[in-house]
Amino acid sequence: MITFAEDIKDVSIYLSLRQQVGWVSLTKEQAQQALDHSLKIITVYDDECPIGMGRIVGDGAVICYIQDLIIIPEYQSRHIGSMLIERLIAYVKSITLKDSRMMLCLMCAKGREVFMKTWIYGKATRQLGPGMIQYIRVEES
């Protein structure tokens, strides 16, 4: 049975899910900090086995990002990602201040654009411009 659990900050689950979808590996310290600084974490389970997760990060007043939306390959195309994103969006709506608006953004993993368009996340427009990303690396001296 598919269930959703909120605010479980389990580094081993996070790192395992990232590894199962082939994402860049993180140190345990990075992963713990990422989880600790998330506004909301929702983990998806099939019975007691973690099969996905998603996080909301941001300032909680003006801008939030959907981050690390993961469903492991053998559970993709079963609408689990849609159920997860519905819960993440509902959370952002619940924290949006009355008579204001929250900007909800994401960086879409390559090949997942069609899924994200379902949720009205489109490509760059003349009004909004493209999303950009820069990775910052600091080497130990």
Which residue ranges define each predicted feature?
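Conserved beta-hairpin
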Residues: 36-54
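Small/polar loops that bind or transfer phosphate-bearing groups
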Residues: 6, 67, 107-108
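Conserved acetyl-CoA-binding loop-helix of GNAT-fold acetyltransferases
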Residues: 71, 77-92
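Conserved active-site alpha-helix within GNAT-family acetyltransferase domains
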Residues: 96-130, 134
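Short amphipathic alpha-helix that is part of the acyltransferase structural core
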Residues: 1-28
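Conserved acetyl-CoA binding element of GNAT-fold acetyltransferases
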Residues: 63-73, 77, 130-133
